[in-house]
Amino acid sequence: DMGIQIHTVVGNHTAYYKDTNEINTIDLLLKQYDNITTYAETEEIKLGNLSVLLIPWINSENEETSFDAIKNSKSKVAMGHLELNGFRAHRGHVMEDGMDIDIFDKFDKVYSGHYHTRSDNGKIYYLGNPYEMFWNDVNDPRGFTIFDTETTDHFHVDNPYRMFYNCLLYTSDAADDIPG
């Protein structure tokens, strides 16, 4: 036992039903571990001396309580599984059907999953996937993010392994046109 505590929020792919977070794969698979806490509802927690608002997937069941918690939070940092407008969901697609970001103006920093690629506006940070999943992920940096609870700084650790590569095929007729 290394004494590591894991805090995780329910996301849209871990919730079994689209309108509730109550039944989710994180609880079902990992509830026997004492060091893992799953958040199916929005909740403020302390990480060291830092208060952080954790926001799971917002759905019809928890929408009102989630927005109330966001509005009333005293935390300076929020972390969640959010679907916000104006960020790249994946290469070639910027989200336009999500939530407005204005509700998060009160926070110094917001970190989120959900979108599969990294993007940010200087205040809200989408962390992306730790690994490539689809062909359109090629050459899109993947990895994980380290967050410092004392300074609220973060940095990305890139995954050095890739699944997808761009390959160019030249026919023998075109080979004469290749420089070098």
For the regions a language model picked out, list residue spans one by one.
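Short, intrinsically disordered, charge-balanced linker/junction segments flanking boundaries
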Residues: 1, 166-169
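His/Asp/Glu-rich metal-coordinating catalytic cores
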Residues: 1-120, 124
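Active-site donor-binding loop signature of nucleotide-sugar glycosyltransferases
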Residues: 57, 82, 129, 149, ...
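A conserved active-site cap/scaffold subdomain adjacent to cofactor or substrate pockets
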Residues: 119-120, 125-149
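Transmembrane beta-barrel architecture of outer membranes
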Residues: 142-144, 164, 172
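Charged, glycine-rich active-site and insertion segments that engage polyanionic ligands
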Residues: 155-167
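Conserved small/polar residues in nucleotide/adenosyl-binding loops
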Residues: 170-177
